[in-house]
Amino acid sequence: MSNVRSKICGITRIEDALAAAEAGADAIGFVFYAKSPRAVDVRQARAIIAELPPFVTTVGLFVNASRCELNEILEVVPLDLLQFHGDETPQDCEGYHRPWIKALRVRPGDDLEAACRLYAGARGILLDTYVPGVPGGTGEAFDWSLVPARLGKPIILAGGLSADNVGQAIAQVKPYAVDVSGGVEQAKGIKDAAKIEAFMRAVKQA
């Protein structure tokens, strides 16, 4: 049985958040990036969070957001953790009085160990698939052999995960956590409760 943590990202509906919690997800993610088909506004996020049971971490995903925009969201949405998924510098990620993680889009030749040292203040590093011009949610997996055995930070593995491949991903990479969005959807931004349940079952059995 696996102790790997899990996050269901791109939540836009209360029923999907509750399905994730019921299936045993440790965290749910809200995308505050207007260009994403999974984007939510503060009203949606607040309404969903208000219905959550305890012990489900709420994560806000941001892509090159201004400090002003981010602070305005944090004033009204009770987020536990921030996820920076753009070209943010370490300085851009600090100063919000919230723990944070940094997403890196993995390409051959990238020095992931150096990147982890650069983002020293991050609680973890999320590794995602590199697709030019697309900051995340690609639905494509990357070459997991590019991940070093030790990175010095908890690894959150993302990119094209589903119930069909997450067991293999966990066995190969041995991440702290896995992050899924498209792999548990019936349409972009609309989750499928059965797929969430199957994904969580595969994680626990890995």
Swiss-Prot record:
Listed pathway(s): Amino-acid biosynthesis; L-tryptophan biosynthesis; L-tryptophan from chorismate: step 3/5
Upper classification of the organism: Bacteria, Pseudomonadati, Pseudomonadota, Gammaproteobacteria, Pseudomonadales
The protein's name: N-(5'-phosphoribosyl)anthranilate isomerase
UniProt KW Isomerase keyword: yes
EC number: 5.3.1.24
Catalytic activity: N-(5-phospho-beta-D-ribosyl)anthranilate = 1-(2-carboxyphenylamino)-1-deoxy-D-ribulose 5-phosphate
An individual GO BP term: L-tryptophan biosynthetic process
Alphabetical list of InterPro entries matching this protein: Aldolase_TIM, PRAI_dom, RibuloseP-bd_barrel, TrpF_fam
Top-rank taxon, per record: Bacteria
Listed Pfam families: PRAI
Homology family: Belongs to the TrpF family.
Molecular function via GO: phosphoribosylanthranilate isomerase activity
HAMAP family linked to this entry: PRAI (MF_00135)
Keywords: Amino-acid biosynthesis, Aromatic amino acid biosynthesis, Isomerase, Tryptophan biosynthesis
